[in-house]
């Protein structure tokens, strides 16, 4: 049973899952909208919203924390300087998930995840 289980495994090892979320987060920050499976989008939503909340602080330590998660200078810079300031007055809810289609081949439900 999965009662009170805190996260989705996404059929991956912990290191693979961490790398997947990092790459999806970078793609979302750089493009501001990506298409992925619904399960990945839901997992990414909690990951990216925590990052944006950290980035909203705007100080040097927040910059270092965000970079530690993303390990990408351009994405960190864009998140800190462009994206996070847009959400200063918003308390959470920075992303939107829109279900789109089922993927041919494995019939996985797909969705767009975008920054609001």
UniProtKB/Swiss-Prot annotation:
Keywords: Ribonucleoprotein, Ribosomal protein. GO terms for molecular function: structural constituent of ribosome. Transmembrane segments: none annotated. It holds the Pfam family Ribosomal_L17. One of its GO terms (cellular component) is cytosolic large ribosomal subunit. PROSITE patterns: RIBOSOMAL_L17. The keyword Flavoprotein does not apply. GO terms for biological process: translation. It comes from the Bacteria. InterPro entries: Ribosomal_bL17, Ribosomal_bL17_CS, Ribosomal_bL17_sf. NCBIfam families: L17. PANTHER family: LARGE RIBOSOMAL SUBUNIT PROTEIN BL17M, RIBOSOMAL PROTEIN L17. HAMAP family: Ribosomal_bL17 (MF_01368). Belongs to the bacterial ribosomal protein bL17 family. Part of the 50S ribosomal subunit. Contacts protein L32. This is Large ribosomal subunit protein bL17. It comes from Nitratiruptor sp. (strain SB155-2).
């Amino acid at each position: 049973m999965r009662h009170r289980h805190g996260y989705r495994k996404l059929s991956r090892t912990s290191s693979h899952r961490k790398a997947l979320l990092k790459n999806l987060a970078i793609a979302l920050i750089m493009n501001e909208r990506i298409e992925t499976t619904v399960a990945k989008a839901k997992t990414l939503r909690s990951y990216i919203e925590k990052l944006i909340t950290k980035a909203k602080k705007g100080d040097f330590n927040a910059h270092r924390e965000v970079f530690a998660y993303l390990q990408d200078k351009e994405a960190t810079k864009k998140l800190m300087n462009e994206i996070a300031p847009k959400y200063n007055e918003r308390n959470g809810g920075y992303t939107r998930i829109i279900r789109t289609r089922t993927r041919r081949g494995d019939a996985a439900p797909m969705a767009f995840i975008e920054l609001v």
